[in-house]
Amino acid sequence: MRIKKGDSVLVTTGKDAGKKGKVLRVIPDKNRVVIEGVNRVKKHQKPSRSLPQGGILKIETPLNASNVMLVCSRCNKPTRIAHKIMENGEKVRICKQCGEALD
């Protein structure tokens, strides 16, 4: 997948389009990502040992990875990425806007 945990991303489509956030979790087999503060839904939680009071919780739900764009840390713009193999054999993600390595 082109997006990794901890990356800064911009949501491009849906009800949260235009919001920026940090990737909390990546689910590669379903091509989904969970982003901090984005795509929040209300979950009705029954009382349990871990949450004795119960109540309504707001949780982040996964988005399809195709609906987000990586934000470059150097140029601070949403960008597509390229992959490049360095001389030492390491595969690195490259920003298409400024050419800077993202890893």
Curated annotation (Swiss-Prot):
CDD domains linked: KOW_RPL26 (cd06089)
Protein keywords: Ribonucleoprotein, Ribosomal protein, RNA-binding, rRNA-binding
UniProt cross-references to InterPro entries, sorted A to Z: KOW (IPR005824), Rib_uL2_dom2 (IPR014722), Ribosomal_uL24 (IPR003256), Ribosomal_uL24_KOW (IPR041988), Translation_prot_SH3-like_sf (IPR008991)
GO cellular component: ribonucleoprotein complex; ribosome
MF terms (GO), sorted A to Z: rRNA binding; structural constituent of ribosome
A GO BP annotation: translation
Gene3D superfamilies associated with the record: 2.30.30.30
Role description: One of two assembly initiator proteins, it binds directly to the 5'-end of the 23S rRNA, where it nucleates assembly of the 50S subunit.
Subunit details: Part of the 50S ribosomal subunit.
Family membership: Belongs to the universal ribosomal protein uL24 family.
Official protein name in the record: Large ribosomal subunit protein uL24
Organism: Syntrophomonas wolfei subsp. wolfei (strain DSM 2245B / Goettingen)
